[in-house]
């Protein structure tokens, strides 16, 4: 089935190219320049219809009326239909669509080719977009501008092709982490936490003062907390693991993968989380998805005093609270057994995929060109960040001056722009320029980022682990192993954290189950296929 998809894709891509050549003339067949320029095809006066999957976050629900969506679609000449899928179900829905080839949208946002998608790509379910650089001149130019050519080339799979257009960052930044009640720390004489022992002592004190509370609560789902905490323990596994496998972690010193989910590092992390749970310090309401309003209410009312979340959410919670002197602060990563680290990030992020079925459209080239303009052109990428000049901001020389409704908003500029205008909505914004982003935050945020940059020799935020260069058969084998491993791990994580399974008496059974599911073979596949 998958092999036939590959053949179908080859045929449809050839047909699409032929149609593009007929529309553009023979000049379209010439190799593009380094900047990726190419003559645009003749287009209709009518907007091009494009359907799209969008990963919807409950703390930032999608709206068709967002200014950024409306303006960029108009500029690119797109009649856009967005299917907003809850972020907790998103990967499952994408996997189903790509595996079956049924009811696929034209465009899938917020994806990469780690894990199962590698197999799907190599077996023909996803368009190798790097084959068509002349259709993505804006993407090419932005890659060149930000100096990310090598970073983007690293995303190629075993066949030398890249299957998505990634988010582009000039530099990663610390946008979320541990957020706590600063007013409580000041009242009780606590210093800012530096270690997980410090965190435990603060949570324990708050519980003693507020017996009905669960001091540490969770945003959206437990995986948000896990992915921000685990790197300080030297691991990243589970639903939002940095490797994209759910099971494996990456050893940055050795430059290789290891069975992170069954490591002693994992056991140590789970023991810490179980300790918090057993002592009533961790919110037991962890079933995903967690409503954003519920999370905000818990923080604002004092039912909780700590969370792992994002800086732009602080203003809204502070405004909602009726507690005198209520004040939140975000802190740099806490030091654990492996140092102080945050969830890994790279200068490229998840991006845009075109399912193979999109290549069957007669106007496939126009679809790609429209998407390229809507997300990567200078004009549109600026709108996704800043909004529309004259509406959300004006320019005073080189200085960005935000509108009064943004500067006076109790939720802060960044969050208000997200909620009201769709600017900075992660699945939609594909060009992130640090200096421009920092203009939306206050001096406190800039200072936090400066502090983080000076820790761990500038390595608090480690790069994402490398993607193995699987061939199509190995990618299929890896994908077939990954799913049962990842599913089982989620069950065991929950059991260990809540105490329904013991980290002492049940750990060996857990390890045995993972080995029966061939985690060692899975890890060997990854290491054997790393780029040399």
Give the positions of each predicted feature.
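Bacterial N-terminal signal peptides that target proteins for export
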Residues: 1-11
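Extracytoplasmic/secretory soluble proteins
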Residues: 11-13, 17-532
